[in-house]
């Protein structure tokens, strides 16, 4: 608080408490929606950073929050598909363990579609250029394509390979989206 502002300090405190108490202590062990709800804590850093720099909350950091928020489920559920037994043995109720592989694949695909649309919104609000829009469309299309391939895949062996591929691509995807937003606004 002494080095930023009260708004940033408050948001950071809420984020930490939410992550530690709501997500880690309470939800992680109780519900397969732990990733969706806990994803909010992981998505708050752009808003906190923005408030440190500006002292206010505007639409720009909210869009960044939404990108991370809608990225989180497909990223972690892909991981939980190819590490299902580990989660099961640890008694962590990830979606593949509680609802099955088919439901998880449907959810991964749905979240990838939502993410695709959300990632394009900075362009529609005038926060990024056509270069960002085209690049985000291409890498987002590939992400949706991978998630669709997983959705229709019947082979357990190939499902695990695709899930692992989605997990690692999702990391690259998020890095590229945020790097492109940054470079597009220099």
Which positions does each model-derived feature cover?
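Interfacial loop-to-transmembrane junctions
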Residues: 145-176
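Hydrophobic residues within alpha-helical transmembrane segments
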Residues: 14, 18, 40, 66, ...
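Solvent-exposed interhelical
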Residues: 70-120, 126
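Small-residue-rich segments of transmembrane alpha-helices in multi-pass membrane proteins
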Residues: 36-53, 102, 164-178
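Transmembrane alpha-helical segments that form the membrane-embedded catalytic/substrate-channel core
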Residues: 17-24, 66-83, 116, 139-150
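Helix-coil boundary and interhelical linker segments in multi-pass alpha-helical membrane proteins
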Residues: 1-10, 45-68, 120-132, 181-186
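Intramembrane alpha-helical segments
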Residues: 1-53
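Hydrophobic alpha-helical transmembrane segments
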Residues: 9-13, 36, 61-65, 105, ...
């Amino acid at each position: 608080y002494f080095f930023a502002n009260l708004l940033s300090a408050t948001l950071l405190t809420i984020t930490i408490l939410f992550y530690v108490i709501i997500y880690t202590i309470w939800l992680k062990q109780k519900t397969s929606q732990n990733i969706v709800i806990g994803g909010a804590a992981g998505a708050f850093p752009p808003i906190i950073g923005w408030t440190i720099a500006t002292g206010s909350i505007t639409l720009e950091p909210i869009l960044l929050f939404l990108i991370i928020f809608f990225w989180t489920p497909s990223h972690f559920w892909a991981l939980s598909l190819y590490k299902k037994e580990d989660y099961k043995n640890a008694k962590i109720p990830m979606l593949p363990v509680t609802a099955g592989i088919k439901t998880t694949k449907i959810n991964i695909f749905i979240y990838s579609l939502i993410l695709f649309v959300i990632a394009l919104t900075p362009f529609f609000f005038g926060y990024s250029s056509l270069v960002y829009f085209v690049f985000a469309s291409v890498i987002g299309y590939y992400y949706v394509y991978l998630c669709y391939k997983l959705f229709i895949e019947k082979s357990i062996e190939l499902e695990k390979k695709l899930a692992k591929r989605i997990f690692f691509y999702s990391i690259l995807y998020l890095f590229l989206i945020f790097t492109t937003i940054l470079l597009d606004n220099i």
